[in-house]
């Protein structure tokens, strides 16, 4: 059959062109010049890349074959160091250099990756250990959060904020307090669909990892950095670390998934696709306190009172999923009373685990007094 012959020839040619590249490990000869590389591993459907310039794809990313991924039990979000071969003169350049040597995975030998547990199989518990935010007497925001909505390691908290209510200042205050009081925690600030000047401000004022995608980028970039950032956090938790992720904000992340996700045909009110809300829920649901050490704390800002039906629908989906809520009040913010915290509407579930009994009784008494005002 002539057609089969043509197809066979095409298939052979495709194999020679590099279609079979994903299952072949690159070979190194003695006279090759090796260049060291490091970055976060991003595993896609048929191939993987080491993102060398942050969490977004870049021109200097390094290709990793699936054979290397399987052989070393690599996972998305692993921090990888290794080497690539410098192309020789006259040699055809590949679009991406291939990883020829793997030196370390998350700061340890590559062989150690096989024994680590899987994040989804770890046992989640209520937060047991308090993340105290109070630092200096003049820092009121962190003190009020400690009183009204205490945070523990493994908390899944929502910061419910109308526009211009000071949520960015609250997030910066939380980030700086964690850096001062809990230096053992790995801090990640994820800014999605954010203003460029806000990103710069956050990078300069926060001593932690700031991962950002500004509003002038496509929705796919927003979803890419969010997914890779949360996978990075999960890999650290698997190693027993305490990780704190501050997300600004989950409403815009939901909007980005709504734009980027393929249409399912089922549209909720407000123009939200029914499948678009699952990925941000997966992001937020990753927060947990692990039984045998390690925790992932996620504090995410959610926008309300924006006048958008879509924002309302997204917020309603997340309303009951957190175990802590800090609500900001627009009326207080308009009077320039900061931090504009709505004390009655804010609180933490199972706060008695985080606080000693005598402190809890005093705080309840304070709440009753404030409620009566």
Where are these regions (language model features)?
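Acidic low-complexity intrinsically disordered regions
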Residues: 1-47, 51-59, 76, 89
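Beta-strand/loop nucleic-acid-binding surfaces
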Residues: 58-72
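Short, charged beta-turn/beta-strand-edge "cap" motif at the junction between a beta-strand
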Residues: 68, 84-91, 164
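Short nucleic-acid-contacting surface segments enriched for D/E, G, S/T with interspersed K/R
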Residues: 69-81
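P-loop NTP-binding catalytic core
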Residues: 74, 87-159
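P-loop NTPase nucleotide-binding module
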Residues: 137-194, 230
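P-loop NTPase catalytic core
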Residues: 175-177, 187-373
């Amino acid at each position: 059959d002539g057609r089969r012959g043509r197809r066979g020839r095409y298939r052979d040619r495709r194999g020679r062109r590099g279609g079979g590249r994903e299952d072949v490990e690159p070979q190194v000869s003695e006279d090759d010049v090796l260049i060291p590389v490091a970055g976060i591993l991003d595993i896609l459907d048929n191939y993987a890349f080491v993102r060398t310039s942050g969490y977004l794809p870049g021109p200097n990313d390094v290709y990793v074959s699936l054979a290397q991924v399987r052989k070393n039990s690599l996972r998305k979000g692993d921090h990888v160091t290794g080497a690539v071969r410098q192309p020789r003169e006259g040699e055809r350049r590949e679009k991406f250099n291939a990883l020829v040597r793997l030196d370390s995975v998350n700061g340890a030998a590559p062989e150690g990756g096989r024994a680590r547990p899987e994040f989804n199989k770890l046992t989640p518990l209520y937060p047991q250990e308090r993340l105290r935010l109070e630092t200096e007497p003049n820092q009121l925001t962190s003190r009020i959060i400690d009183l009204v909505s205490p945070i523990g390691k493994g908390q899944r908290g929502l910061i419910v904020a109308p526009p211009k209510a000071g949520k960015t200042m609250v997030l910066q205050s939380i980030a700086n307090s964690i850096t001062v009081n809990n230096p053992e925690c790995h801090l990640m600030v994820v800014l999605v669909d954010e203003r460029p000047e806000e990103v710069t401000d956050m990078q300069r004022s926060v001593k932690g990892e700031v991962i950002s995608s500004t509003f002038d980028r496509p929705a796919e970039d927003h979803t890419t950095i969010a997914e890779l950032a949360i996978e990075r956090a999960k890999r650290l938790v698997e190693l027993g670390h305490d990780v704190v992720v501050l997300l600004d904000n989950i409403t815009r992340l939901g909007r980005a998934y709504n734009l980027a996700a393929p249409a399912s045909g089922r549209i909720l009110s407000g123009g939200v696709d029914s499948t678009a809300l699952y990925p941000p829920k997966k992001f937020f649901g990753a927060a947990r306190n692990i039984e045998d050490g390690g925790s992932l704390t996620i504090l995410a800002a959610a926008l309300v009172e924006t006048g958008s039906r879509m924002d309302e629908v997204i917020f309603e989906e997340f309303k009951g999923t957190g175990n802590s809520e800090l609500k900001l009040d627009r009326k207080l913010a308009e009077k320039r009373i900061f931090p504009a915290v709505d004390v009655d509407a804010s609180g933490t579930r199972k706060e008695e685990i985080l606080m000693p009994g005598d402190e809890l009784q005093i705080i309840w008494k304070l709440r009753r007094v404030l409620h009566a005002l």
